[in-house]
A protein has these predicted regions:
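Short, hydrophobic/aromatic-rich segments at coil-to-beta transitions
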Residues: 60, 89-93
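Structural motif
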Residues: 78-79, 92
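Short, surface-exposed beta-strand-loop junctions and turns on beta-sheet-rich folds
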Residues: 41, 45, 102, 121-124
Length: 151
């Protein structure tokens, strides 16, 4: 039986295409928030964002944040790199479905066995019981945020 993943209004699924050439960018050693040192002004290495964030494409999802329930940590249109091969830990942010509901982004509280929104304006939390069907799409591994508006 084919199972379709349904997201709620706070998430949008983005497919990952892994074919094609990788692009590399030069990484400079650190960025000082104070006064820079001339000794630190050298090239470090080249990286591929594919290799950093898509090292296991078969276990990686990208979701776009919609809504404000996880603000201020997550903003509208942020991209989440979600890994389905990570074991969920206390305090992780997860994409999850409870009792066949739409998938949503929430923080996991292992101690109190609940999922909750971090925005204080969204007091909604879900207590998880033994009877609940919990389907974890994955754990948020990284966040991509555009700082400038697209032209």
């Amino acid at each position: 039986m084919m199972k379709f993943i349904k997201f709620d209004e706070t998430l949008e699924f983005l497919p990952i295409k892994t074919e094609g050439n990788k692009k590399y960018v030069v990484v400079r050693e650190g960025v000082n928030a104070g006064f820079p040192s001339p000794a630190e002004d050298f090239l470090n290495d080249r990286i591929s964002l594919d290799e950093c964030y898509l090292s296991k494409p078969e276990a990686t999802f990208i979701n776009r944040v919609k809504g404000q329930s996880m603000y201020p940590e997550y903003h509208e249109n942020d991209l989440l790199i979600v890994r389905s091969d990570y074991e969920v830990q206390h305090g992780d942010d997860v994409v999850v479905s409870i009792n066949r509901s739409a998938y949503t982004l929430k923080r996991y509280d292992k101690i109190q066995s609940k999922l909750y929104a971090i925005n204080p304006n969204y007091a909604h939390s879900v207590n998880i019981t033994e009877e609940d069907e919990v389907i974890l799409l994955g754990v948020v591994d990284a966040l991509v945020r555009n700082r400038k508006r697209k032209k």
